[in-house]
């Protein structure tokens, strides 16, 4: 098992929590980001700046039982299909049961924006968001039976 972080748009406190909890539970943490981001990590993969390049690398790295951290609903759906667990930076676990709704909502908002409409962006990140993420990740790490990693 490994933690894979879609680090292109990952808040620093989330990345820090992943690194700390990965160390605490002896789970390797892989970060994937374009060359525009400076990430300090033992296992960092730099990708180009092309559209979806980081997402494709995350998908290719992901194996059954891994934990993926992303705010991209499309990427979340893909890694769930590979048997991974997936958590948002605000600590919400993505599940197969809620992906259809999230992807439909994303499509509706995209259509509205293409038609010239506006959609509400995410609210400002709070300290509570950071704590919720850390608690959620630790809870999921504790629930996964340990097995050796390569």
Curated annotation (Swiss-Prot):
Top-level taxon of origin: Bacteria
A Pfam short name: DUF188
Family: Belongs to the UPF0178 family.
Protein name: UPF0178 protein Swol_1505
């Amino acid at each position: 098992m490994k933690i894979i972080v879609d680090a292109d748009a990952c808040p620093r406190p989330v990345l820090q929590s992943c690194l700390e909890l990965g160390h605490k539970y002896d789970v390797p943490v892989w970060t994937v980001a374009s060359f525009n981001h400076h990430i300090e990590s033992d296992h960092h993969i730099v990708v180009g700046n092309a559209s979806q390049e980081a997402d494709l690398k995350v998908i290719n790295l992901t194996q059954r039982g891994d934990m993926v951290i992303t705010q991209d609903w499309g990427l979340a759906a893909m890694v769930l299909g590979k048997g991974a667990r997936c958590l948002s930076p605000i600590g919400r676990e993505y599940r197969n049961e809620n992906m259809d709704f999230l992807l439909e909502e994303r499509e509706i908002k995209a259509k509205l924006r293409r038609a010239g409409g506006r959609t509400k962006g995410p609210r400002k990140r709070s300290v509570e968001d950071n704590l919720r993420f850390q608690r959620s990740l630790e809870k999921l790490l504790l629930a996964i039976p340990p097995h050796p990693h390569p």
